[in-house]
């Protein structure tokens, strides 16, 4: 009976080993199709937990074998090899973390200066104390209470209601502002999409305006940027009664929202924009169409056709106008660009090239690449990648808006 129990336990551990290996593979393997993207995005973010899981399997195997009642040398050898592979894969992000953080630190110091962190202690006390806090991977990142006003109508073009959310610190005051633009391939999303980040950053002393825009494929560019500009005009007209300091404003966007944020910040906004934060945003839409990544989980060409209403051959001027790289000039807002090295939706090479062009034009630019991160890595808000990104995002915003 004991031998049967040990055999069952061994096979059960084998199943767990394969589960751990399957999840760990997605740390390095990009998603070939959209439905597998959650695995490719999520696995690196929970990799410290996978390390613990994968290490426990050979330990439990050893416990069973130490009883001496069940011997399968070949099975043991295969199991140990697979366990070793799973452990190596799951440890990869943690091994790379220190190097990635050091590179990020060098980039921000090179652009903003050694004294960029000379900020009031009342502000720094609210920030992340470290680029990675292991306990927060499981316990979550704390977010103090803030005041939230949702579903405020700011425009109604063609009978389509466009709304925004306003996030404000708990105490009444006059605060710098952050305009937040969600992503979603220009086809989906709403002002609640980045709710966790918006609440978190508002608690540090900002008024966050989470805006919306009309979606493709029903509406093609430039409708989306027109809606964003209309939202900025609304913010300008309602700053006084929403505790918003219009002299200190930044724009942040993710993916498609970052493309719109860059255009809004770089092309004559209705009021001065001090800073731009771009999370994995498309930079050159013509190049993105002509040189699609492999694999291509969102079918990039179909996505761009839905957004722009054609191809670079049929609507070349729209592709040019929609590409932030063509808006680069001198005297632009300081820019923080954050991309994932594993991203096969918006490859990090485009962010790197944008950073080079911005710097060449004399603009303060911070480029951070997170080697193991996929597109939308911050969907796992307390994950490894977002902890690193958040650490520098909050410091960059404080430098730009408060210092």
Regions found by a protein language model. Give the residues of each.
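N-terminal cap/lid segment of alpha/beta-hydrolase-fold proteins
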Residues: 23-54, 58, 121-172
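Primarily recognizes the serine-hydrolase "nucleophile elbow" in alpha/beta-hydrolase
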Residues: 26-30, 230-293
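Catalytic nucleophile-loop/oxyanion-hole region of alpha/beta-hydrolase
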Residues: 45-46, 189-198, 209-248, 380-389
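Hydrolase active-site cap/lid region
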Residues: 111, 115-130, 262-315
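Short beta-strand element of the alpha/beta-hydrolase
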Residues: 174-184
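Short beta-strand/loop motif that positions the catalytic acidic residue
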Residues: 331, 336-339, 343
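Conserved alpha/beta-hydrolase "acid-adjacent" motif
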Residues: 344-350
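Catalytic active-site module of serine/aspartate enzymes centered on a nucleophile-bearing elbow/loop
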Residues: 384-403
């Amino acid at each position: 009976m004991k031998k049967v129990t040990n055999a069952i336990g061994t096979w059960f551990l084998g199943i767990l080993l394969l589960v751990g290996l399957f999840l760990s593979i997605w740390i390095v393997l990009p998603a070939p199709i959209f439905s597998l993207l959650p695995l490719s995005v999520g696995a690196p973010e929970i990799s410290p937990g996978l390390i613990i899981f994968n290490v426990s399997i050979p330990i439990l195997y050893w416990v069973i074998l130490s009883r001496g009642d069940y011997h399968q040398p070949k099975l043991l050898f295969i199991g140990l090899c697979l366990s070793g592979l799973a452990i190596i894969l799951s440890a990869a992000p943690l091994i790379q973390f220190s190097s990635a953080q050091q590179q990020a630190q060098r980039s921000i110091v090179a652009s903003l200066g050694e004294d960029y962190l000379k900020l009031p202690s009342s502000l720094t006390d609210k920030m992340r104390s470290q680029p990675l806090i292991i306990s927060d991977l499981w316990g979550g990142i704390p977010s103090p209470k803030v005041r939230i006003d949702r579903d405020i109508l700011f425009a109604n073009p063609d009978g389509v209601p466009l709304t925004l959310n306003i996030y404000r610190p708990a105490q009444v005051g006059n605060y710098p502002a952050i305009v937040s633009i969600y992503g979603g391939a220009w086809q989906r999303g709403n002002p609640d999409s980045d709710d966790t980040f918006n609440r978190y950053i508002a608690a540090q002393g900002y008024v966050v305006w989470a805006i919306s825009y009309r979606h493709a494929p029903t509406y093609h560019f430039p409708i989306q940027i027109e809606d964003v500009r209309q939202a900025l005009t609304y913010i300008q007209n309602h700053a006084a009664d929403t505790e918003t300091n219009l002299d200190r404003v930044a724009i942040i966007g993710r993916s498609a929202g970052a493309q719109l944020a860059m255009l809004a910040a770089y092309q004559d906004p209705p009021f001065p924009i001090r800073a731009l934060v771009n999370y994995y945003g498309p930079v050159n839409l013509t190049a993105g169409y002509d040189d699609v990544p492999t694999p291509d989980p969102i079918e990039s060409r179909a996505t761009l056709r839905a957004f722009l209403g054609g191809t670079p051959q049929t609507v070349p001027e729209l592709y040019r106008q929609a590409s932030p790289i063509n808006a680069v000039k001198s005297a632009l807002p300081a820019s923080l660009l954050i991309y994932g090295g594993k991203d096969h939706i918006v490859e990090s090479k485009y962010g790197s090239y944008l950073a080079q062009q911005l710097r060449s034009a004399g603009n303060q630019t911070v480029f951070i690449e997170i080697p193991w991160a996929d597109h939308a890595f911050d969907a796992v808000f307390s994950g490894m990648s977002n902890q690193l990104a958040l650490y520098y995002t909050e410091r960059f915003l404080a430098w730009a808006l408060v210092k």
